[in-house]
């Protein structure tokens, strides 16, 4: 009973962070299962495992996207690492609003249940994660499935907005003495920018899906041309949220990678201020490029020219970050421990994803590539090998701090190599499929595409072996037989750590700081 009360009513940022991690792991496993079902269906031409039920295929696609985005990456990155480490890194005793933190988490399980219900009632919600009308309208999806998905989004959106308010307040008001804004660790900066993006973009999504809800149930015509509405309005509203959302997913990863590259190169991050302002620029520009998802809906040519140019400009701050990471490693004594492997893998694969993004930014090219597997390849390189690699990197980097036990290094490296090989084998062939015109979200395809699809499906099976490896690592780390206690700083940073988390014991006390730490200097590494 005491344990139940501790976890149910917890107001401790570390406990809530741990809950977010557990939740993210569960949702991630579900999302992975759906993705494997998708790849099994696409392994060869013709109907494979779904018996010709093509609506079910689209339900799988939709559920896979929602699970991975709203219930895996966001809870783990912002809720997990954010809650665990933002207060510690800024020298705060806890979050600004501990009970708000609790409700932010507990809104997510009901939201997840609503999402799963939407896949299970009637014929499910086969709209894709974009939920475009008229397909999501009452005529095309007559049951309650889409309504359940909308309520699910509302709940997880409220959760994220409350969490954002909490992070913004905490970072602005609860920094320890001497912790100026320009001394904040980069992970804290990344969470701050992310919180602002969430706060500004989610209300727009809420408005769009509420209008969709009334269109479906109360006979309004916001998105119905018959009553003077316009389905393109929905697309504008959705992508005004949807584009900042993809930066919300990757920015905390940028912060994690900066910490890891710095630690394992044995030198401070190259161009700290440049890194900070690059993240802020990405955040601002992220709101100015949404219509590049809509080049095929008949936008004016001048509009397309603007969105092409603006999208390419986002590559500049992103490039600054990539080159700063490389410059940080340049001339350092690099240790290739598991977190560093994932970080280097992140930089390499995220760069490939970014380059295909530059290709897609060209409105002329995008008209040919829109809704093909080229787009799927692009955003999976950014997410499946960007956000997810950053999550794994952060896990291996901080797992000793969180649990107070060290992970098995060899097994961690095996996990990295299997995953690296698997995800590349899955998503690289998709570029070729897209360039030869294979459309997204279609469960069958001409025989000409069979070769690359077979390879891609094989890669996804390898990735699953990698995930299993990861859970073996977690099990071994947490098992009672693991006597390898973790030092306050497992990466030997006691003398020259530039961040606070390595100054406290592993795991940190229930109340991290007996007295607030005073920060004198954050830049120098003692050699």
Swiss-Prot record:
Short name of any one Pfam family annotated for the protein: COX1
Positions with a binding annotation for Mg(2+): 370-371
EC number: 7.1.1.9
Coiled coil: none
TM segment ranges: 18-38, 66-86, 103-123, 148-168, 186-206, 237-257, 269-289, 312-332, 340-360, 379-399, 414-434, 458-478
General function of this protein: Component of the cytochrome c oxidase, the last enzyme in the mitochondrial electron transport chain which drives oxidative phosphorylation. The respiratory chain contains 3 multisubunit complexes succinate dehydrogenase (complex II, CII), ubiquinol-cytochrome c oxidoreductase (cytochrome b-c1 complex, complex III, CIII) and cytochrome c oxidase (complex IV, CIV), that cooperate to transfer electrons derived from NADH and succinate to molecular oxygen, creating an electrochemical gradient over the inner membrane that drives transmembrane transport and the ATP synthase.
Entry's family note: Belongs to the heme-copper respiratory oxidase family.
Protein name: Cytochrome c oxidase subunit 1
Gene giving rise to this polypeptide: COX1
